[in-house]
Amino acid sequence: MSGGLAPSKSTVYVSNLPFSLTNNDLYRIFSKYGKVVKVTIMKDKDTRKSKGVAFILFLDKDSALNCTRAINNKQLFGRVIKASIAIDNGRAAEFIRRRNYFDKSKCYECGESGHLSYACPKNMLGEREPPKKKEKKKKKKVPEPEEEIEEVEVSEEEGEDPALDSLSQAIAFQQAKIEEEQNKWRPSTGGPSTSDDSRRPRIKKSAYFSDEEELSD
């Protein structure tokens, strides 16, 4: 859910509304019951006129419940309003998705230019104060810790030894390193030995009669 909203529990279905009410009118009417997130009026797809039905999405379910109790079967502009918690039809996520209207030259309500829907002459309850624009926070140049971790992981992958192409090679490589460390610290009776001597395997004859040879450390 977007921002923690639960539209299946916080959306009010309102019917028998006056056809002349606009989105802004309904916003002002229902805002007294709580924070209104979105207002959707059902309109005829051909005439674009209201069907007298709307969905009011509140920020929390308590506000939605208070709204239904307050206005259900109550008169509004001469009509008896029906209100209830909307039944989720599986399109809740789509309903709460914010829509951006990039064409600011025309009013969303009436389609005429020169004003926006907040100041549309068709608003029965007058103009509504437009919401304040959110100030964009400047991003800090310092990378976030998560990004730093990702960069470290990438650099490690790039620096891998090409000899470690398989599991067996990796085991052999690690074993060779261990033996090299052991040979460095092993006391020698015949004087100091070079690193090349310590790493070179010694060959000795087998104890039993054979032409085979076996390796010793």
From Swiss-Prot:
It is found in: Nucleus, Nucleoplasm. Residues 120-217 are annotated as: Disordered. The keyword Nucleus applies. It holds the Pfam family zf-CCHC. One of its GO terms (molecular function) is zinc ion binding. GO terms for cellular component: nucleoplasm; U12-type spliceosomal complex. A zinc finger (CCHC-type) spans 105-122. Keywords: Metal-binding, mRNA processing, mRNA splicing, Nucleus, Phosphoprotein, RNA-binding, Spliceosome, Zinc, Zinc-finger. The modification Phosphoserine is found at S155, S210, S216. Residues 10-88 form the RRM domain. Gene3D superfamilies: 3.30.70.330, Zinc finger, CCHC-type. One of its GO terms (biological process) is mRNA splicing, via spliceosome. It comes from the Eukaryota. Residues 145-163 have a biased composition (Acidic residues). Component of the U11/U12 snRNPs that are part of the U12-type spliceosome. Interacts with ZRSR1. This is Zinc finger CCHC-type and RNA-binding motif-containing protein 1. It comes from Rattus norvegicus (Rat). The lineage of its organism: Eukaryota, Metazoa, Chordata, Craniata, Vertebrata. The gene is Zcrb1.
